Amino acid sequence: MIIFVSEEPERRLAIVSNLYALVLKPVGKKPSDKPLCAIELLQKNDLKKYGFKRLTSHEIFGVIGLIEVNGLLFVGAITGKSKVAQPCPGETVNKIFAVDFFCLNDNSWDFIEIDSSGYPVLPETASTEYQDALPKHPCYELKKLLSNGSFYYSSDFDLTSTLQHRGYGQHSLSTDTYEEEYMWNSFLMQEMITYRDHLDTNLKQILDDEGFLTTVIRGFAETFVSYVKKLKVALTIISKQSWKRAGTRFNARGVDDEANVANFVETEFIMYSSQYCYAFTQIRGSIPVFWEQGTSLINPRVQITRSFEATQPVFDKHIMKSVEKYGPVHVVNLLSTKSSEIELSKRYKEHLTHSKKLNFNKDIFLTEFDFHKETSQEGFSGVRKLIPLILDSLLSSGYYSYDVREKKNISEQHGIFRTNCLDCLDRTNLAQQIISLAAFRTFLEDFRLISSNSFIDDDDFVSKHNTLWADHGDQISQIYTGTNALKSSFSRKGKMSLAGALSDATKSVSRIYINNFMDKEKQQNIDTLLGRLPYQKAVQLYDPVNEYVSTKLQSMSDKFTSTSNINLLIGSFNVNGATKKVDLSKWLFPIGEKFKPDIVVLGLQEVIELSAGSILNADYSKSSFWENLVGDCLNQYDDKYLLLRVEQMTSLLILFFVKADKAKYVKQVEGATKKTGFRGMAGNKGAVSIRFEYGATSFCFVNSHLAAGATNVEERRSDYESIVRGITFTRTKMIPHHDSIFWLGDMNYRINLPNEDVRRELLNQEEGYIDKLLHFDQLTLGINSGSVFEGFKEPTLKFRPTYKYDPGTGTYDSSEKERTPSWTDRIIYKGENLLPLSYSDAPIMISDHRPVYAAYRAKITFVDDKERLSLKKRLFTEYKQEHPEEPGSLISDLLSLDLDNKSTDGFKSSSESSLLDIDPIMAQPTASSVASSSPVSSASASLQPVRTQNSSQSRTPIKKPVLRPPPPPAHKSVSAPAPSTSKEKSPTPQTSTASLSSVTKNIQENKPLAQNRRIPPPGFSQNILTPKSTSNLASPMSSKVDLYNSASESTRSAQDARQQTPTAFAASRDVNGQPEALLGDENPIEPEEKAKLNHMTLDSWQPLTPK
């Protein structure tokens, strides 16, 4: 494809394929306008009259979507790729190494090359001042991310699916069947996909087959060619990381409220030969509980942030998703029994065994394998002790296999191994590699391709298998941490050398640096790509239908939205380091059972003593004391409260409780901290914050301890501003980005009066004395002037100053310092949906402060997403019926193309070249028993894919079959060659002039003699299993192609691609452009006074008027 631009009569971009052109133009020019883009699909020849000219010399290999950055609309396109894998004939995987973004509504970036730093490349004559004034390309960071070698796409098949799911030979590119979880450009493509969904089948096919919609995954793909005895096989790994909880190592941990876990990766190992096709799938993912880990340099502390009861429903949801998709899940937990990991491991097991939805030892199995302990004596080879522990599950879940000659499925995999360590990286890589090899060996023995006593670790296919897994481990680690995997030396060579150990040490140091200094920027780039930044909106495609539906939906919002009220109790208490057990009922239930809030958020300050030693060595066990004390008090009545979140920073602590029956409405619970003590280096001052969403309404709570001192008003203002800027949640959400905000804590604001004047007013208690003192309150003055806490309100304050008391008494400070009584402890709020009910202090005397509480009623909005979607679909149908031929709509534009009478040459099927149709010398086993990790050994250099016809038809999903054992042997070849070892003579090289007949003959020589299948052993089935993805048989075997044609096609493809194509692609060819390793190299390189309680009712709490 090629991209063109025209300014006549208005700016438009056209992406042109063989037959059609996709024309895009911006709609609306005001900066306040929402990002809109119009789209047309025209015949290629219709572009001539619009004065289009080529925008770039680079070929466009696929469109990845639309994005708006700083008011500019860009279309993203793949402009550099290399072929890296071919799991089956006609299925090619491409690695993306170059992406460009072309602006739709501004020509400033047309025809400009960008340097490696994102700035325009200027002629040498340009002045330095002019160069310094130039801006960086708005999409440079996205471009750099997408071009880092971890993103892949395919023009031939659905790369988001597994081979078993899509079916052998089913090369569908329809977005109807894509798994959105692995589609990393889903935000960029979502409006284009929605638009496509409104088209009929023929029009969908054009968009699919012309490559206008490209699905991009992130992960790994690579193919090696090897031999199993003398049978040539292609070994492939395709790995896909989910974007649902994507992020860098310490920014993405555990599970979220939607049951998505960090670093969730689906990995499929595929073997293809002329006889059989085999596939085995595994998954990995962070432990599905709510936990976090700090970024301290040494042994960062693991913190579980949500109670067991509140976590269990989300845990069950995550595991059940896997069970429904894959079948029984066997969990392999590699965490150690060290103090840093044991708590997390115990919680994992408790959730598995105490679940009421999961059938333990039926739907879910658990094997605990302390990796560090098991490998401490005999090295990493001790991981092999894992196989006997999981062997029963390995045999019962089986694998996917397909008979290439008879074109039918033999078996399916009905179960999955879910492996994890702490990061799901280094230990997990090694364990998954061992499991994969055990499953592959089982397949080879079942099908009598090897015998049980002929398997040796030095076999070439074993070395290639291990190298694939090592390369895969490095790539996944690069994505998550920025370095290669640890232990990869053992993965490749089966042993750990001194160089490997030194390499691991270097990687560990690199990870510490990256985690602390680089991950924040990387996380923001990921969030930009995924559309997670505040107020970031997808570019919408202008369409009269869409405008009609959007307007109608807005006017009919009452049909899918509802409102409700909830009660909240907010409390703040400076406990002055006290750990004395006390009844908190007068604070948490000030009118007893008559007010039991739905949500309770408490902020505590000075939970540890503020001494230099305690600040540097914070005792985080104090949080457990207050969690239990508050929890016991809240649960003294029939209503049960669950602890959903705890956030602690040194002496600051915030607790979030919710009624058990309301917990299902709470999502996206997060925490954040900001230090302001000692210029931001210490946590004695600062803030801890939590945020969550209740229904469709967002809440944020900030518990702060600001600078002390009667005259330090400016320092407190500075602390406030620092906290507002510094508190950042995931997806770069900040405090102002919420519907309801509560700020509470020991704010340390004082009364601007002499001490004796304040004490006299408090002693005399004349009418209106509270209001009189408030006229001199620093916080009240600051809010009224707008100098601090702009937009915040405080309920009517009618209680006496809360500081400073002699502990255990009602007497204000009688010490030598005699501090002026002040309202240091406050609760203020911001939000139109909030109604204050009560604001007072509580008579709890364990500290020199009094606790304060505020009760609120909040209006909550709920959105019924299913009803909204149903209404949206109905409105679309109504519009189409009323405007069947409205001009200007994409549908009528496409229908006018008269597709039935047009040539469909672009959809004709071409002959497919199989990777195994190439001369056998290509991947001949070498004398060395260890395969090189050089990319030259990868089959990517030899892949010659030809575009095939793609189907846009939806596949009807088939319900998950019951568990079955692995299959019986399919073919028994009486002429099977003798076992091959590394000492055997390699197959005779073919000359470079090998003809088609000689290549075909060579493959046919490996064909086993036809004979009856032997009777399967007990427990095995002779039934042929139907693939879940289709009821059709696979397409016939692709015909063989002439070797020189394939080579010449590859040469042309390489010339069309960018010159920056990886060296591996070029290094594998001789001076004549022929693939050397394929043709003649015998040894190829490898790869607030209160009313009496008994007279007080809830009705007596009338809404308070803010000051």
UniProtKB/Swiss-Prot annotation:
Its EC number is 3.1.3.-, 3.1.3.36. It is an enzyme of class 3 (hydrolase). It holds the Pfam family Syja_N. Residues 943-956, 987-1005, 1020-1038, 1045-1063, 1097-1107 have a biased composition (Polar residues). PROSITE patterns: SAC. One of its GO terms (molecular function) is phosphatidylinositol-4-phosphate phosphatase activity. It catalyses: a 1,2-diacyl-sn-glycero-3-phospho-(1D-myo-inositol-4,5-bisphosphate) + H2O = a 1,2-diacyl-sn-glycero-3-phospho-(1D-myo-inositol 4-phosphate) + phosphate. The modification Phosphoserine is found at residues 497, 986, 1035. Changing residue 746 to A: Abolishes hydrolysis of PtdIns(4,5)P2. InterPro entries: Endo/exonu/phosph_ase_sf, IP5, IPPc, SAC_dom. GO terms for cellular component: actin cortical patch; cytoplasm; membrane. Changing residue 424 to A: Reduces hydrolysis of PtdIns(4)P. It is found in: Cytoplasm. Residues 927-942 have a biased composition (Low complexity). One of its GO terms (biological process) is protein transport. Residues 926-1107 are annotated as: Disordered. Changing residue 427 to A: Reduces hydrolysis of PtdIns(4)P. Residues 142-482 form the SAC domain. The modification Phosphothreonine is found at residue 1105. Keywords: Cytoplasm, Endocytosis, Hydrolase, Phosphoprotein, Protein transport, Transport. Dephosphorylates a number of phosphatidylinositols (PIs) like phosphatidylinositol 4,5-bisphosphate (PtdIns(4,5)P2), but also phosphatidylinositol 3-phosphate (PtdIns(3)P), phosphatidylinositol 4-phosphate (PtdIns(4)P), and phosphatidylinositol 3,5-bisphosphate (PtdIns(3,5)P2). Controls the cellular levels and subcellular distribution of phosphatidylinositol 3-phosphate and phosphatidylinositol 4,5-bisphosphate. Plays an essential role in a TGN (trans Golgi network)-to-early endosome pathway. Involved in clathrin-mediated protein sorting at the TGN. The SAC domain is capable of hydrolyzing phosphatidylinositol 3-phosphate (PtdIns(3)P), phosphatidylinositol 4-phosphate (PtdIns(4)P), and phosphatidylinositol 3,5-bisphosphate (PtdIns(3,5)P2). Present with 1520 molecules/cell in log phase SD medium. Interacts (via SAC domain) with BSP1; the interaction is direct. Interacts with CHC1. Belongs to the synaptojanin family. In the central section; belongs to the inositol 1,4,5-trisphosphate 5-phosphatase family. This is Polyphosphatidylinositol phosphatase INP53. The lineage of its organism: Eukaryota, Fungi, Dikarya, Ascomycota, Saccharomycotina.
